[in-house]
UniProtKB/Swiss-Prot annotation:
Keyword Methyltransferase part of the UniProt annotation: no
Entry protein name: Heat shock 70 kDa protein 1-like
Positions annotated to bind ATP: 14-17, 73, 204-206, 270-277, 341-344
Domain of life: Eukaryota
Protein function: Molecular chaperone implicated in a wide variety of cellular processes, including protection of the proteome from stress, folding and transport of newly synthesized polypeptides, activation of proteolysis of misfolded proteins and the formation and dissociation of protein complexes. Plays a pivotal role in the protein quality control system, ensuring the correct folding of proteins, the re-folding of misfolded proteins and controlling the targeting of proteins for subsequent degradation. This is achieved through cycles of ATP binding, ATP hydrolysis and ADP release, mediated by co-chaperones.
InterPro entries associated with the record: ATPase_NBD (IPR043129), Heat_shock_70_CS (IPR018181), HSP70_C_sf (IPR029048), HSP70_peptide-bd_sf (IPR029047), Hsp_70_fam (IPR013126)
Written domain comment of the UniProt record: The N-terminal nucleotide binding domain (NBD) (also known as the ATPase domain) is responsible for binding and hydrolyzing ATP. The C-terminal substrate-binding domain (SBD) (also known as peptide-binding domain) binds to the client/substrate proteins. The two domains are allosterically coupled so that, when ATP is bound to the NBD, the SBD binds relatively weakly to clients. When ADP is bound in the NBD, a conformational change enhances the affinity of the SBD for client proteins.
Pfam families: HSP70
Segments passing through the bilayer: none
Gene that encodes the chain: Hspa1l
Source organism: Rattus norvegicus
GO CC annotation terms, alphabetical: cell body; COP9 signalosome; cytoplasm; cytosol; mitochondrial matrix; mitochondrion; nucleus; plasma membrane
Entry annotated with the keyword Nucleotide-binding: yes
């Protein structure tokens, strides 16, 4: 792979998970790994045959706990006799030894004992992140910005830099995680004068609160506080204990000593916890958990909040401490930024918001990606990316939801995709659905769902006075234009007459709040699979209807009068009418039924059309390879490919 000199990546090297991003084509891309995950476990495992990094390592931890290393970030840059190392050692299933005052991890690899420095373990994770980026970019990458907690001392920073070097990276800079998060939100741009930012970072294994002041692009850390042992894993532990007790009650058996059962339960608990951030209840189904007993149960969000109540409430203490240390009143904080996957928990957000008297929280960037996002921006700036996008990137806003209009069948046709930087302008050509249709109704929606009924209607207007023409002939040009203030102008123009109409939608009227946007985006993810099926179903229905209409009009064509026998013509027309009336009665049929009907119709029509073609027919139906085109179902307008 040839290296691309001008490209640099940003890496968030986390205690439990890591994340990598790159700035290209005017925006930051957070890069998914080979498993399709945008965050990668900071785990390295050694077996008799191989070394595993990331998801593969974490997935086998139950079978191989002594040789699966994680939490290297808790060791890096520390001495063996450091109290932190001594207390953490008691909790790890792997062995840590003392070599000349430095800690090393002892594992069995390919049948022999091997000791690794924390820098080496971290470098393996960094290598994985580097390879993830290279697979995405298609060329090798050496330049990187790596993030560390604000409280890391010089030796921890240097050790992290060394880990980068071991991984074959040229570390452009080590930057603080809270600074990266602030850069991601562009908080260093825009306002003149000093800004105070509180970064609330609740990750998988650690909790950090930082207060930064940003003045003219200069970042200063005023205070840090937190708990190096509070995070998502602690919430998982509470769930595990709860279910171990439940299993005891239901089945009179204690599973807590069975490592594999506990590990499987923990994995299910982590999944349930994530579900509870978007749903009020989660189900656990674990087959043959212990002694052949299936464990099927559920937990509500309220119960989860009760189990972790003291931990959640405890997150406010470091917030108060950091404000005291910074000698700052909470009213003086301009921005509150959420970082770390655990800040998705609604109760955590509510406690923080209530503490700051209902202030808005910055959470539009995925909280587990915000640090890598900022690191990627910083990397581009350090590489001298002079594009206006980098210089102004942090001034630019984005469209929080996709914007589009309703086309035939109630389908949402998107013109401006979610997270497009604004200002932006997109144009697409649409057409009429019925013959001699005098006008079209343009209905503007925002949302991520495939069907407009599930999205939010922003406004509608009519474009009238379209000259009579067959369906599909008029060309209606629709333009969506969002200016820098987020104001949307939608214009529709009939290209034949130049007649146009427009609507202006300002962002305060009928737009969704940040919370609703968050909720819709989460819902959309959940529904994406359903939507895909729905989209395929409508495409199949459209294809069938289109084929039937086109065959009908083709055999009714004056030019074909003498070329086709009345019986063939009747056969086609009858079959088309039968299909169209079946369609009327079966709007909600499955994709397979629509496809089956279309094949049936094609099998009947194709021999007749072929016969026509062989008899020297001319006209649209008779062009070689003719297949009636795709049209749409339903009311108003139809998309032209």
């Amino acid at each position: 792979m040839a290296a691309n000199k001008g490209m640099a990546i940003g890496i968030d090297l986390g205690t439990t998970y890591s994340c990598v991003g790159v700035f290209q084509h005017g925006k930051v891309e957070i890069i998914a790994n080979d498993q399709g995950n945008r965050t990668t476990p900071s785990y390295v495992a050694f077996t008799d045959t191989e070394r595993l990094i990331g998801d593969a390592a974490k997935n086998q931890v139950a079978m191989n706990p002594q040789n699966t290393v994680f939490d290297a970030k808790r060791l890096i840059g520390r001495k063996f006799n450091d109290p932190v190392v001594q207390s953490d050692m008691k909790l790890w299933p792997f062995q840590v030894i003392n070599e000349a005052g430095k800690p090393k991890v002892l594992v069995s690899y390919k049948g022999e004992k091997k000791a690794f420095y924390p820098e080496e373990i971290s470098s393996m994770v960094l290598t994985k992140m580097k390879e993830t980026a290279e697979a995405f970019l298609g060329h090798s990458v050496t330049n990187a910005v790596i993030t560390v907690p604000a409280y890391f001392n010089d030796s921890q920073r240097q050790a992290t830099k060394d880990a980068g070097v071991i991984a074959g990276l040229n570390v452009l800079r080590i930057i603080n995680e809270p600074t990266a998060a602030a850069i991601a939100y562009g908080l260093d741009k825009g306002s003149h004068g000093e800004r105070h930012v509180l970064i609330f970072d609740l990750g998988g294994g650690t909790f950090d609160v930082s207060i930064l002041t940003i003045d003219d692009g200069i970042f200063e850390v005023k205070a840090t506080a937190g708990d190096t042992h509070l995070g998502g894993e602690d919430f998982d532990n509470r769930l595990v204990s709860h279910f171990v007790e439940e299993f005891k009650r239901k089945h009179k058996k204690d599973i807590s000593q069975n490592k594999r059962a506990v590990r499987r339960l923990r994995t299910a608990c982590e999944r349930a916890k994530r579900t509870l951030s978007s749903s009020t209840q989660a189900n656990l189904e674990i087959d043959s958990l212990y002694e052949g007993i299936d464990f099927y149960t559920s937990i509500t969000r309220a119960r989860f909040e009760e189990l972790c109540a003291d931990l959640f409430r405890g997150t406010l203490e470091p917030v108060e401490k950091s404000l005291r240390d910074a000698k700052m009143d909470k009213a003086k904080i301009h921005d509150i930024v959420l970082v770390g996957g655990s800040t998705r928990i609604p109760k955590v957000q509510k406690l923080l918001q209530d503490y700051f008297n209902g202030r808005d929280l910055n959470k539009s960037i995925n909280p587990d990606e915000a640090v890598a996002y900022g690191a990627a921006v910083q990397a581009a700036i350090l590489m001298g990316d002079k594009s206006e996008k980098v210089q102004d990137l942090l001034l630019l806003d984005v469209a929080p939801l996709s914007l589009g209009l309703e086309t035939a069948g109630g389908v949402m046709t998107v013109l401006i995709k979610r997270n497009s930087t604004i200002p932006t302008k997109q144009t697409q050509i649409f057409t009429t659905y019925s013959d001699n249709q005098p006008g079209v109704l343009i209905q503007v929606y925002e949302g991520e769902r495939a069907m407009t009924r599930d999205n939010n209607l922003l406004g509608r207007f009519d474009l009238t006075g379209i000259p009579p023409a067959p369906r599909g002939v008029p060309q209606i040009e629709v333009t969506f234009d969002i200016d820098a203030n987020g104001i949307l102008n939608v214009t529709a123009m009939d290209k034949s007459t130049g007649k146009a109409n427009k609507i202006t939608i300002t962002n305060d009227k009928g737009r969704l709040s940040k919370e609703e946007i968050e909720r819709m985006v989460q819902e959309a993810e959940r529904y994406k699979a359903e939507d895909e099926g729905q989209r395929e179903k409508i495409a199949a229905k459209n294809a069938l209807e289109s084929y039937a209409f086109n065959m009908k009009s083709a055999v009714g064509d004056e030019g074909l009068k003498d070329k086709i026998s009345e019986s063939d013509k009747k056969k086609i027309l009858d079959k088309c009418s039968e299909v169209l009336s079946w369609l009327e009665a079966n709007q909600l049929a499955e994709k397979e039924e629509f496809d089956h009907k279309r094949k049936e119709l094609e099998n009947m029509c194709n021999p007749i059309i072929t016969k026509l073609y062989q008899s020297g027919c001319t006209g649209p139906t008779c062009a070689p390879g003719y297949t009636p085109g795709r049209a749409a179902t339903g009311p108003t307008i139809e998309e032209v490919d």
